[in-house]
Amino acid sequence: MSKKKVVLAYSGGLDTSVAIKWLSDKGYDVIAVGLDVGEGKDLEFVKEKALKVGAIESYTIDAKKEFAEEFVLPALQAHALYEQKYPLVSALSRPLISKKLVEIAEQTGAQAVAHGCTGKGNDQVRFEVSIQALNPNLEVLAPVREWAWSRDEEIEYAKKNNIPIPIDLDNPYSVDQNLWGRSNECGILEDPWATPPEGAYELTVAIEDAPDQPEIVEIGFEKGIPVTLNGKSYPVHELILELNQIAGKHGVGRIDHVENRLVGIKSREVYECPGAMTLIKAHKELEDLTLTKEVAHFKPVVEKKIAELIYEGLWFSPLQPALSAFLKETQSTVTGVVRVKLFKGHAIVEGRKSEYSLYNEKLATYTPDDEFDHNAAVGFISLWGLPTKVYSMVNKEMKEKQEKKEVTS
């Protein structure tokens, strides 16, 4: 009887390398899948390491373009910030990784998929809910959650089975990175009072070390999609990576956040999202210029729900396409250029222009060129305030009647 096949989300790190051997010992043929979503991973090294450790097959996928266009872009257009701070760096990549795991499982005839998440984090939920939504017939395995070893026990298992141990194993932090940013937790960061050491950061410089001269960038959008940076056209994923470099050297995008995890605990996380935070700010400013008041005031309701949906692992739920349909409709006129000054940790929008601009200078000006009909304000104010006026009149009358009644009684 042939062995069962399992498709493993493989990073090349200690946990998933040990998982290959552990799953093999459990009787599975392991197929490793590694994705590059913008963290600069050496895909060939990851592929070869998986085979060396014991995988029967190893797939590597450069998914930066798909990640940026299908997952990051909707989050940008939704200004998706969980709890108004976190740009959903890791949460956005999980549905894409799940999608690729399921696709390869179906191609190879695998009966199961596996991930390297612990039993304490959000990612286990994101992976398993996504996989169940895409193919309910696949079994989902979580080796790290199941074996529940200490770090020392895991290292001992690796040594015993000749599994290569990463040279950065002494790094106290748990890091996840993609083109939308970098997340960092554990070590001293677990103390919410402790100042994050500079060694916890990689994409951004400290404000004290940032240049003393600002840098101006111009970001061009077409229907809500960032397409140019300083006049040069880029694919979305390349534009984000380029902006990470530019904004990061000015200390833009550091976020220190105590967040409410999906599993019920609070967690202190440190994020670096220079490109993401710059783009979100620029995109919103362009929307302020091109969206009507009603759309601009309602959109944050949808944005909050989209952020929660992504964070909570519900990308493939029925609600997501419904929210996306609204989002897509709002972007039809979000075309133009935004000028941003990057300086000492800040991304400051200094200018915006669009052929769809709803800003009319002749209506807004206080100069002699003013074309606003001031006399129209009289009737508008009367009608606008009428409900409040009527309410006040009625209640004043009722109060007077009540006072007279109390005097005579």
From Swiss-Prot:
It is found in: Cytoplasm. This is Argininosuccinate synthase. The lineage of its organism: Bacteria, Bacillati, Bacillota, Bacilli, Bacillales. Belongs to the argininosuccinate synthase family. Type 1 subfamily. PANTHER family: ARGININOSUCCINATE SYNTHASE. Its EC number is 6.3.4.5. L-citrulline binds at residues 86, 122, 126, 174, 183, 259, 271. ATP binds at residues 9-17, 116. The gene is argG. It comes from Halalkalibacterium halodurans (strain ATCC BAA-125 / DSM 18197 / FERM 7344 / JCM 9153 / C-125). Homotetramer. The keyword Lipid metabolism does not apply. It is an enzyme of class 6 (ligase). It catalyses: L-citrulline + L-aspartate + ATP = 2-(N(omega)-L-arginino)succinate + AMP + diphosphate + H(+). Pathway: Amino-acid biosynthesis; L-arginine biosynthesis; L-arginine from L-ornithine and carbamoyl phosphate: step 2/3. PROSITE patterns: ARGININOSUCCIN_SYN_1, ARGININOSUCCIN_SYN_2. GO terms for cellular component: cytoplasm.
